[in-house]
Amino acid sequence: MIAEIVTIGDEILIGQVVDTNSAYISKELNKIGVSVHQITSIEDDRTHILQTLKEASQRADIIIITGGLGPTKDDITKKCLCEFFDDKLVRNKKVLKHIEELFDKYIDTPISDLNRDQALLPSKAIALHNEYGTAAGMWFDNGGKVYISMPGVPYEMRGLMEREIIPRLMQNYSRPVILHKTVVTYGLGESAIAEKIESWEDNLPKEIKLAYLPNLGRVRLRLSARGDNEDHLRNLIDSQITALHEYIGDIIFGYEDEDPVEVVIGKMLAERNWSLSTAESFTGGRLASKFTKAPGSSASFKGSLVCYFTEAKKELLNVSEELIKKHSVVSAEVAKAMAQGARDKFHTEFAIATTGNAGPSKGDSDADLGTVFIGIATPDGVTAHQFNFGNHREKVVGKSVNKAMELLQQSVIKFTKND
């Protein structure tokens, strides 16, 4: 089945709001074998909405619409759907009851007629229960096509996808099996990897497609398989990844579709009752955030210090003023001192530290823009690694976080082998 997503809202087109909904919807549809072939963002304009719905219906089996279901005059999606389906709005008693209950339980202001009017739905629509908001989702079967309308609020849309839309699609429509496995690599660019795996890629089975996805110092290789037999496709992908290891096994970092690297590191640490801390300068807590977002991180991650200011490095991490004066704040020596300071402060087996010059100015150091030092403290001692990640601040920060994770994983693996 082919799907098309239509997002409605001026706020998306002027860049005020980033469209994260389409990425989520596409990912969830792909999991159940529905392919998204096009995503279109349009303004809150009647003519534009009607024309887009007409065009989408000629390309797709499922048309998913988000946005324009609020209570104000600029929310015109329901009126446009009525015009498109030659329908009229009628009050849905079940939806109205839900709206009144939400106001009674959670909203301090009195319910207004505008709020009650959100229970007006096209008569041909099947109402989809929105547990988290007042705008009901809508499902239309028309001319062999499915049209689905949802609010643009991300958590409301996700609730409808999980509880209403995905279950209905799975129950009512047969779909092919689509499987993905994404190999995460480091240390080589995509062109260098392509050269190393050329013969492997040329001999991939016809059911498998390969995509190169470079991002912030890593290259992801996504293998996608499509067919009718899930076990066959899964075995096919696994066998190809086994073969891939013969070509680039030394730079394979992990698998994106399984546990992310921060979870893998956390599990390795927790299994041995080891712990981790971080000390960060220009990365501003991004490294610690990777770990705290991971489920179960409290079993191994003790804490972090963000020491952006030079004085903070001295006061909180015991980095000596003499060391800073001699080597500068962006140096291997300071990176090592920061890592050791974090290890001592939090009493952890492992600690990792970042110091660098992400730009746009040089700050407290004469180091070139993009210069980064990553320090790692382990039970065996402290090491530091130097890199230069260019002159784009966000790119420098992102690459530094990724590289720090790689170095940490390598250090932990080394100790697990000796354990």
Swiss-Prot record:
CDD domains: cinA
UniProt source species: Christiangramia forsetii (strain DSM 17595 / CGMCC 1.15422 / KT0803)
InterPro entries: CinA (IPR050101), CinA-like_C (IPR036653), CinA_C (IPR008136), CinA_KH (IPR041424), Competence-induced_CinA (IPR008135), MoaB/Mog-like_dom_sf (IPR036425), MoaB/Mog_dom (IPR001453)
Name of this protein: CinA-like protein
Pfam families per UniProt: CinA, CinA_KH, MoCF_biosynth
PANTHER family to which the protein is assigned, alphabetical: NICOTINAMIDE-NUCLEOTIDE AMIDOHYDROLASE PNCC (PTHR13939), NMN AMIDOHYDROLASE-LIKE PROTEIN YFAY (PTHR13939:SF0)
Matching NCBIfam families: cinA_nterm (TIGR00200), molyb_syn (TIGR00177), PncC_domain (TIGR00199), PRK00549.1 (NF001813)
SUPFAM superfamilies: CinA-like, Molybdenum cofactor biosynthesis proteins
Gene3D superfamilies per UniProt: 3.30.70.2860, CinA-like, MoaB/Mog-like domain
Family: Belongs to the CinA family.
